[in-house]
Design a protein with these regions (language model features):
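Inter-motif core of Ras-like GTPase G domains
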Residues: 69-91, 97, 103-107
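Conserved Walker B
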Residues: 63, 88, 122
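Short acidic active-site motifs
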Residues: 67-71, 93, 134, 157
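Conserved catalytic-core motifs of eukaryotic protein kinase domains, centered on the activation segment
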Residues: 33-34, 94-95, 128-129
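Generic enzyme active-site microenvironment
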Residues: 59, 85, 118
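Conserved P-loop small GTPase signature centered on TRAFAC-class small GTPases
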Residues: 1-20, 24-28, 47-54, 108-214
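Switch II (G3) loop of P-loop NTPases
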Residues: 55-70
């Protein structure tokens, strides 16, 4: 996907680590404790405002099951911000990060993309199987950024973090502005506010796309 269409963001990781709920948080939606495992790749388009200009971006939610990994290869292409997600209460999901980073590097090489290691479900600290120090060491080993978060307890924090990454990319790459925000729909087809004061009522679109290629 070229920047003319928007900045491509993708979340990768094993099934059940909370990728979908992180996306809900990023788009200002509510945490869904009954969220089911993603079995098709879906994307959501939205807009970030920066310096009185609007910029389009797309967030891809991917299936984490091994059977879908070959399909994910298609969707990683042209990604600019990549979140490698694991759950702190699942050592196995953390161990699989090596697979995902190698997968991304194989497809994207040494491009201008940003990769972030995300330790999700920090609210489940009583069941924590991955220590903070191990997460830090892994990020240093892979030479990527890291963030420990919770889609349940810190959804707003993750939303703000994504927006800062988008702004960083916009500044660095002189990303093309869009003329006006698109009128779209939310995760549950209802309007959601983009900010706390309710002044921005742009909506978001969810689209299922198991075989779409940019």
């Amino acid at each position: 996907m070229s920047d003319d269409r928007g900045i491509k963001v993708i979340l990768l990781g094993e099934a059940g680590v909370g990728k979908t709920n992180l996306i809900h948080a990023a788009l200002g939606g509510k945490f869904n404790p009954n969220s089911s495992t993603t079995i098709t790749n879906e994307f959501y388009d939205s807009v970030v405002s920066f310096n009185n200009k609007n910029y389009a971006y797309f967030i891809w939610d991917t299936a984490g099951q091994e059977a879908y990994r070959a399909i994910n290869k298609i969707f990683i292409k042209d990604s600019k911000i990549i979140f490698l997600v694991f759950s702190i209460d699942s050592k196995k999901s953390f161990e699989e990060i090596d697979f995902w980073i190698n997968y991304v590097n194989e497809i994207l090489g040494k491009g201008d993309h940003i990769i972030i290691l995300i330790g999700n479900k920090s609210d489940l600290f009583l069941n924590q199987e991955v220590e903070d120090e191990d997460i830090k060491k892994k990020a240093e080993e892979l030479k990527i950024r890291m963030k420990i978060t919770s889609a349940l307890k810190d959804g707003e924090g993750f939303k703000n973090y994504l927006e800062e990454l988008l702004k960083e990319y916009i500044l660095k790459h002189n990303t093309k502005e869009i003329e006006k925000p698109k009128e779209t729909f939310t995760l549950d087809q209802e309007k959601i506010e983009n900010n706390n004061d309710g002044t921005n009522k742009n909506k978001k679109t969810k689209k299922k796309c198991p075989c779409f290629k940019f």
